[in-house]
C-alpha cells in the first residue's frame, strides 16, 4: 500500500489549484532505481547482452543526468496521479509543474525528500448573490397578420414564370442576363475572374456588390453601360476588399416574372394544402406559433441575463477552450451539412481566428450553464424520475431506429433539457418580468409572470408557409467560375 503523501493545497486565481506535495526519500529512490533498471534493459552497449548492462557502466555511458530525468518524469506522473486521487480533486485539462522541469531536476536527489508543486484547473464552484426577486425586461413579439400576405407573395415569386421582356427598361424584381468585365478604379487593373458572359442576375437589393444591380436597373436589352461599384470591406476575396471598381455591362436579355394567380391551384402548387383558405389558415397558425416561441425565447434570454448578473464564478481557461472547441465542432458540422469541404476551409489560420472570435460566446454559454447549475443547487430543484422516464419515452418514439441510439447519452440529454426547462419555469414564477413593446420601449407593458411549459431556448423557427415551394425556372447561360466567386450575391 502506497504511503499517504504530504499535500498542501492552495487556491489560485482563475479556478486553479496548487498542490505542494512532499515526496518521501524512499519513493524518490525507488523511482530512480526503476529508471536504472528500465534503461539497462533498453540500452545496447558493445560487449554486454541487452538487459545485462551493469549500473556503473550504464551511468558512465549515458550519463547520470539522463537517468535522473527519466526517474523524475515517472515520479512526477505518479505523484500527480496519487495526490489528485488522495485529495479528491476534480481536475480539468492538463496539470503542470509550478516552475520548469529543469529547475526541479537540479533539486532532485534520489536519497532525499523532494517537494513538487503542481498546478491545475479545477471545476469552478458557481454561487449566486440572489435567486429570487430578479428583475428583467423582454421584448414582446406580436403576431402580424400582414406577414401572411408577404409570405404568399414570396411564394408567388418563387413559382413565377420568367418571360422575355423587350419593350421596357429593367426594374427591380426582374432577372437580367448580363455580360460584363471589371477593373479596379484605382489602378485600372483587371479584376481576376471579374468577367462573365450571359450571367443571370436577380435585380434585388443586396444581391450583388454595391452599385451593380442599381446600375443595371434602367437599362434596356442591348444597352451597354459603365457602372461604378464598391466591394465591401468584408468581401471574401482579400484583394477586392474595400476597393472601388468599374464594370462595363451589357444587358443581353431581360426577363420579367409572371406571377401565378392567388387561387386554390396556387395553394396546391406551393404547399400540401388543397385550397387557398387552408393555406392562409396554416400560415396564420405557423406565424402565431412563431411569435409565441420568439416571445418565449426573449423571456428566457432576459431571465438568463438577469441570473448571470447574480453569478459569482471564475472560469478556468481549460473549460473556456473546451467550450470553444465545442463551438468550432458545431460550426464544422453545420458547414458539412451544407456540402462544404470542411477540411479545406478549416485551415490552421482560420481555426485560430474562429477560436478567438468564439471566445465571447463560449464564455457566455459557460456562465449561463453554471448560473443554472447554481440555481438548481441553491433552490433544491431537480427532475422527478417519472417525468424523466416519460420524456425519454416521448423522445424515443420519434426515432425510426432506436437501436442506433445510445441510451445513456439520450438519458443525459433529456435530463439536461428537462432540468433547464424546470429552472427557467421557476425563474418566470419568481422573477419580475416586464414585457416591453419593441416599437415603443418607453411604454412598457404590464409586468407579467407568465408561466412556461418548455424552457429550452430554441432557435427562432422560420415561419415559412411555402411548403414544397418550387424554384423558379432557371435559364442561365455560360458563366465563369471566377465570376461566380467574385460577383457573388451578398446576403
Swiss-Prot record:
Q: Name one GO biological process term.
A: protein transport
Q: What Pfam families has UniProt attached to this entry?
A: FKBP_C (PF00254), Trigger_C (PF05698), Trigger_N (PF05697)
Q: Where does this polypeptide localize?
A: Cytoplasm
Is the keyword Transport in the record? no
Q: Which residue positions does the secretion signal occupy?
A: none
UniProt enzyme class: isomerase
Q: Which UniProt keywords apply?
A: Cell cycle, Cell division, Chaperone, Cytoplasm, Isomerase, Rotamase
Region of interest (Disordered), residue spans: 435-491
EC number(s) from the headed UniProt entry = 5.2.1.8
Could you tell me which residue ranges the PPIase FKBP-type domain spans? 173-260
Reaction(s) catalyzed by this protein? Answer: [protein]-peptidylproline (omega=180) = [protein]-peptidylproline (omega=0)
An annotated GO cellular component of this protein is:
cytoplasm
Task: List where Low complexity composition bias occurs.
Answer: 463-475
Molecular function (Gene Ontology), one example: ribosome binding
Q: Tell me which HAMAP family the record gives.
A: Trigger_factor_Tig
Which PANTHER family does this one have? Answer: TRIGGER FACTOR CHAPERONE AND PEPTIDYL-PROLYL CIS/TRANS ISOMERASE, TRIGGER FACTOR-LIKE PROTEIN TIG, CHLOROPLASTIC
Q: What is known of its domains?
A: Consists of 3 domains; the N-terminus binds the ribosome, the middle domain has PPIase activity, while the C-terminus has intrinsic chaperone activity on its own.
Q: Which family does it belong to?
A: Belongs to the FKBP-type PPIase family. Tig subfamily.
UniProt function note: Involved in protein export. Acts as a chaperone by maintaining the newly synthesized protein in an open conformation. Functions as a peptidyl-prolyl cis-trans isomerase.
Question: Could you tell me what this protein is called?
Answer: Trigger factor
Amino acid at each position: 500500500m502506497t504511503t499517504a503523501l504530504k499535500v498542501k493545497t492552495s487556491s489560485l486565481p482563475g479556478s486553479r489549484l496548487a498542490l505542494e506535495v512532499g515526496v518521501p526519500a524512499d519513493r524518490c529512490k525507488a523511482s530512480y532505481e526503476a529508471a536504472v533498471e528500465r534503461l539497462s534493459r533498453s540500452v545496447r552497449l558493445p560487449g554486454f547482452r541487452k538487459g545485462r548492462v551493469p549500473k556503473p557502466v550504464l551511468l558512465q555511458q549515458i550519463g547520470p543526468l539522463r537517468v535522473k530525468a527519466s526517474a523524475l518524469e515517472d515520479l512526477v506522473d505518479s505523484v500527480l496521479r496519487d495526490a489528485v486521487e488522495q485529495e479528491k480533486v476534480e481536475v480539468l485539462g492538463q496539470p503542470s509543474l509550478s516552475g520548469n522541469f529543469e529547475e526541479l531536476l537540479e533539486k532532485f536527489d534520489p536519497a532525499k525528500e523532494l517537494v513538487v508543486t503542481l498546478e491545475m484547473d479545477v471545476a469552478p464552484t458557481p454561487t449566486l448573490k440572489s435567486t429570487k426577486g430578479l428583475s428583467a425586461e423582454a421584448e414582446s413579439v406580436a403576431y402580424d397578420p400582414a406577414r401572411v400576405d408577404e409570405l404568399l407573395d414570396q411564394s408567388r415569386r418563387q413559382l413565377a414564370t420568367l418571360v422575355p421582356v423587350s419593350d421596357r427598361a429593367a426594374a427591380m424584381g426582374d432577372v437580367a442576363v448580363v455580360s460584363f468585365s471589371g477593373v479596379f478604379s484605382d489602378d485600372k487593373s483587371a479584376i481576376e475572374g471579374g468577367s462573365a458572359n450571359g450571367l443571370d442576375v436577380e435585380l434585388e437589393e443586396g444581391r450583388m456588390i454595391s452599385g451593380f444591380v442599381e446600375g443595371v436597373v434602367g437599362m434596356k436589352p442591348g444597352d451597354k453601360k459603365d457602372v461604378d461599384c464598391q466591394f465591401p470591406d468584408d468581401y471574401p476575396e482579400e484583394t477586392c476588399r474595400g476597393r472601388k471598381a468599374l464594370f462595363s455591362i451589357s444587358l443581353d436579355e431581360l426577363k420579367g416574372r409572371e406571377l401565378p394567380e392567388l387561387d386554390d391551384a396556387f395553394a396546391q402548387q406551393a404547399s400540401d394544402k388543397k385550397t387557398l383558405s387552408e393555406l392562409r389558415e396554416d400560415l396564420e397558425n405557423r406565424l402565431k406559433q412563431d411569435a409565441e416561441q420568439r416571445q418565449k425565447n426573449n423571456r428566457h434570454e432576459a431571465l438568463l441575463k438577469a441570473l448571470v448578473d447574480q453569478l459569482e464564478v471564475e472560469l478556468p481557461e481549460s473549460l473556456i477552450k473546451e467550450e470553444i472547441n465545442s463551438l468550432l465542432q458545431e460550426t464544422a458540422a453545420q458547414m458539412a451539412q451544407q456540402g462544404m469541404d470542411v477540411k479545406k476551409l478549416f485551415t490552421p489560420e482560420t481555426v485560430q481566428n474562429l477560436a478567438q472570435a468564439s471566445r465571447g460566446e463560449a464564455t457566455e454559454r459557460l456562465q449561463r450553464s453554471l448560473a443554472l447549475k447554481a440555481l438548481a443547487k441553491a433552490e433544491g430543484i431537480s427532475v422527478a424520475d417519472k417525468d424523466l422516464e416519460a420524456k425519454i419515452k416521448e423522445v424515443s418514439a420519434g426515432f425510426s431506429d432506436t437501436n442506433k441510439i445510445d441510451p445513456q447519452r439520450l438519458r443525459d440529454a433529456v435530463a439536461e433539457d428537462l432540468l433547464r426547462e424546470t429552472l427557467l419555469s421557476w425563474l418566470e414564477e419568481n422573477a419580475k418580468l416586464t414585457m416591453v413593446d419593441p416599437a415603443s420601449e418607453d411604454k412598457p407593458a404590464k409586468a407579467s409572470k407568465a408561466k412556461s411549459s418548455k424552457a429550452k431556448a430554441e432557435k427562432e423557427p422560420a415561419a415559412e408557409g411555402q411548403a414544397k415551394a418550387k424554384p423558379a425556372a432557371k435559364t442561365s447561360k455560360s458563366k465563369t467560375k471566377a465570376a461566380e466567386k467574385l460577383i457573388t450575391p451578398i446576403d
